């Protein structure tokens, strides 16, 4: 991989991991437009590691409180401080984990069809715009009931359909439940941590069964760039979220979906 290839893919991963615009739609489009070959599993693991470090770094203080209070709640046998939010993240991760285990390799391959990605990019783009317009936006992530958490978790499982966008569908679900934009986004990004960890771990295990040559310099550079981009993306997303809302992302998804239909239909 040359520097431009590494730079483009790492920036793309860093930005699309957390913006509600579908990373899979971009990752299928970029190689077609640039004429690049597949970057390999090792590079995918590296850039996901970069985004994982970024989101953990951004929420480091909140995560420390959640971990402390969660451990105290286990010892005390009752909720302590931020322990409920920690349990919420764990419960919200269960559906996507269970569905991911049940999906066969054949099903996963079929879902990677460019037209399926195009349809899900457009369809869930409309849903995101509607949720942002119709949602009451009166609650934060700390007010979620267990039923709410399960609803968001089930919505997150839909992200296994490429083109859906994990952050997009979880933010959409949060807005539908009356969360503020910031509350929906914060819970979505907290949910990203175990999901990226699980996906990256499975990919790393799969990598052990491959014999591909590893370019460690490319992996390190890719992880660094994707991590920096992801951190900046999270920071500025929250900074401008209340001002711009979800409509620009929904419109972008519609345009992206239209381009995918044009190229692959």
Swiss-Prot record:
<keyword id="KW-0961">Cell wall biogenesis/degradation</keyword>
<protein>
    <recommendedName>
        <fullName>Undecaprenyl-diphosphatase</fullName>
        <ecNumber>3.6.1.27</ecNumber>
    </recommendedName>
</protein>
<feature type="transmembrane region" description="Helical">
    <location>
        <begin position="1"/>
        <end position="21"/>
    </location>
</feature>
<keyword id="KW-0812">Transmembrane</keyword>
<dbReference type="GO" id="GO:0008360">
    <property type="term" value="P:regulation of cell shape"/>
</dbReference>
<dbReference type="GO" id="GO:0050380">
    <property type="term" value="F:undecaprenyl-diphosphatase activity"/>
</dbReference>
<feature type="transmembrane region" description="Helical">
    <location>
        <begin position="218"/>
        <end position="238"/>
    </location>
</feature>
<keyword id="KW-1003">Cell membrane</keyword>
<keyword id="KW-1133">Transmembrane helix</keyword>
<keyword id="KW-0472">Membrane</keyword>
<dbReference type="GO" id="GO:0071555">
    <property type="term" value="P:cell wall organization"/>
</dbReference>
<dbReference type="InterPro" id="IPR003824">
    <property type="entry name" value="UppP"/>
</dbReference>
<feature type="transmembrane region" description="Helical">
    <location>
        <begin position="244"/>
        <end position="264"/>
    </location>
</feature>
<keyword id="KW-0573">Peptidoglycan synthesis</keyword>
<keyword id="KW-0133">Cell shape</keyword>
<dbReference type="Pfam" id="PF02673">
    <property type="entry name" value="BacA"/>
</dbReference>
<feature type="transmembrane region" description="Helical">
    <location>
        <begin position="39"/>
        <end position="61"/>
    </location>
</feature>
<keyword id="KW-0997">Cell inner membrane</keyword>
<keyword id="KW-0378">Hydrolase</keyword>
<dbReference type="GO" id="GO:0046677">
    <property type="term" value="P:response to antibiotic"/>
</dbReference>
<comment type="similarity">
    <text>Belongs to the UppP family.</text>
</comment>
<feature type="transmembrane region" description="Helical">
    <location>
        <begin position="187"/>
        <end position="207"/>
    </location>
</feature>
<comment type="function">
    <text>Catalyzes the dephosphorylation of undecaprenyl diphosphate (UPP). Confers resistance to bacitracin.</text>
</comment>
<dbReference type="GO" id="GO:0005886">
    <property type="term" value="C:plasma membrane"/>
</dbReference>
<keyword id="KW-0046">Antibiotic resistance</keyword>
<dbReference type="GO" id="GO:0009252">
    <property type="term" value="P:peptidoglycan biosynthetic process"/>
</dbReference>
<feature type="transmembrane region" description="Helical">
    <location>
        <begin position="149"/>
        <end position="169"/>
    </location>
</feature>
<feature type="transmembrane region" description="Helical">
    <location>
        <begin position="115"/>
        <end position="135"/>
    </location>
</feature>
<feature type="transmembrane region" description="Helical">
    <location>
        <begin position="85"/>
        <end position="105"/>
    </location>
</feature>
């Amino acid at each position: 991989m040359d520097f431009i290839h590494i730079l483009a893919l790492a920036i793309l991963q860093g930005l699309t991991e957390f913006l509600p615009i579908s990373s899979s739609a971009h990752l299928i489009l970029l190689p077609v437009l640039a004429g690049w070959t597949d970057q390999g599993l090792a590079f995918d693991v590296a850039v996901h590691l970069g985004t994982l470090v970024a989101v953990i770094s951004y929420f480091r203080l909140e995560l420390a409180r959640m971990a402390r209070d969660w451990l105290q709640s286990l010892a005390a046998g009752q909720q302590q401080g931020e322990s409920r939010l920690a349990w919420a993240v764990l419960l919200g991760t269960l559906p996507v984990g269970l569905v991911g285990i049940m999906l066969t390799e054949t099903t996963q391959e079929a879902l990677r069809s460019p037209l399926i990605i195009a349809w899900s990019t457009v369809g869930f783009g409309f849903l995101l715009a509607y949720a942002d317009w119709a949602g009451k936006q009166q609650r934060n992530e700390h007010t979620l009931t267990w039923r709410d958490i399960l609803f968001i978790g089930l919505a997150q499982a839909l992200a296994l359909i490429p083109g859906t966008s994990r952050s997009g569908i979880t933010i959409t679900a949060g807005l539908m439940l009356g969360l503020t934009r910031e509350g929906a986004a914060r819970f979505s990004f907290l949910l990203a941590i175990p999901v990226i960890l699980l996906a990256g771990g499975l990919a790393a295990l799969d990598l052990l069964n491959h014999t591909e040559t590893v370019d460690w310099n490319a992996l390190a550079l890719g992880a660094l760039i994707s991590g920096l981009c992801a951190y900046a993306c999270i920071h500025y997303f929250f900074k401008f979220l209340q001002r711009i809302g979800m409509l620009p992302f929904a419109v972008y998804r519609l345009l992206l979906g239209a381009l995918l239909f044009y190229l692959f239909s």
